Amino acid sequence: MNQDDKKKAVAQAAVRYVEQDSIIGVGTGSTVNYFIEALAPIKNDIVGAVSSSEASTERLTALGIEVFDLNSVDQLSVYVDGADEITEHRHMIKGGGAALTREKIVAAVAQKFVCIIDDTKNVGVLGAFPLPVEVIPMARSYVAREIVKLGGDPVYRQGVVTDNGNVILDVHNLKILNPVELERQLNNIVGVVTNGLFAARGADVVLTGSESGVQVNE
């Protein structure tokens, strides 16, 4: 299987975690796009979805799946999303698509977080993939200086504005040995909205697409 085949396989496998008559959380990214397509045959079995990005909202709406504002929903049965990197402890780096803040919010409301990935995303230690940090625009330079103090090399993601109207700093050269602590430290910097470490609340289920099929880690 090539990488796209692996993504399609895990996206299809994630459908079994979707409960009938429920509202589900839907993430953002190339693997999630396949999951949205996989929802088409069962779209009449669910009430609708809460989306983590404008891009996913457009795809869901195009399929005729109702998209709800999170403020009108008490809880979500499941949240399905991908990852840029993930460890055996189910800690992740997310946010390559700049949707990290809404992803983290929707994940917090969900009873179960199902992470769908291909096997290239598995790592021993997080940090080879640059860690995205969403920042209030006026605080960009200050936050960058504070990140340098933590040992990172922040790079401004030129030309990108998040759905929330903010900017992204991608932090390079981090070897993240304690992701829970670094997530907290970064979020404590004034001007940071959130960062792409999903460690304090990691994945509950990981579906990995590989040459041998879909591996399930629950």
Swiss-Prot record:
Pathway(s) of this molecule: Carbohydrate degradation; pentose phosphate pathway; D-ribose 5-phosphate from D-ribulose 5-phosphate (non-oxidative stage): step 1/1
Recorded coiled-coil stretches: none
UniProt key word Repressor: no
Assigned EC number: 5.3.1.6
GO biological process, one term: D-ribose metabolic process
Pfam families: Rib_5-P_isom_A (PF06026)
Binding site for substrate: T28, G29, S30, T31, D81, G82, A83, D84, K94, G95, G96, G97, K121
UniProt-recorded Gene Ontology molecular function terms: ribose-5-phosphate isomerase activity
Record field: catalytic activity: aldehydo-D-ribose 5-phosphate = D-ribulose 5-phosphate
InterPro entries: NagB/RpiA_transferase-like, Ribose5P_isomerase_typA_subgr, Ribose5P_isomerase_type_A
Record-annotated active site: E103 (proton acceptor)
Subunit and interaction comment: Homodimer.
Stated role: Catalyzes the reversible conversion of ribose-5-phosphate to ribulose 5-phosphate.
Annotated NCBIfam families: PRK00702.1, rpiA
PANTHER family the UniProt entry points to: RIBOSE-5-PHOSPHATE ISOMERASE (PTHR11934:SF0)
Name the record gives this protein: Ribose-5-phosphate isomerase A
Organism per entry: Pseudoalteromonas atlantica (strain T6c / ATCC BAA-1087)
Gene: rpiA
